[in-house]
Amino acid sequence: EVKQRRRTEPRLRSYGPRTVISIVKTDAKGRQLAAKKQALFARLSKIQGSLINSIERNYWEAKPKLKALATKLNVPDYIIETAWKIYSEVAKQKLTMGRSIEAFVCASLYASIRIHDFPRLLEELTEVAMVQLRSVHRSLGLIVRSVLPVLGLKYRPISPEPLIFRFANELSLTIKVQKEA
């Protein structure tokens, strides 16, 4: 029975170490550590830093940025999950090398938004993320050509219906005008 059950979400993240060893000078109670202990923790921290590979470092930087951007835009969890799948495939294909992680995070989120037909514009994402539109366009092009076919996802044009109602509400137009549009 236990084997038949399937987890609906990951319990622990699948990247990076489970514990972070920092260079500390005090213990949990705030007391000063001995010099030998401080040196030990400094060495352990240095070793741990060298054991993390480039993809894990990339994930460490990208995941909080994706969550922050999605929170600011009020995007549902299923879109964030798809965006993370897209971004992790981008990192696995090493498309981020020499390019902006922020631009790829923004492009991954926008691709996910387009896949799920969520009413957000690219200009909104770039404004909130404070990333240049040009770099996001480049990253989005790479994602559409290289990543989405691998994941089997379809990138569709924006359907105008959700945007009509959204902009009509912002402009305080009547329902009659909204239906006519």
Task: Please annotate each region the language model reported.
Residues E1-A181:
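Non-catalytic, interaction-prone regions of core transcription and DNA-replication machinery
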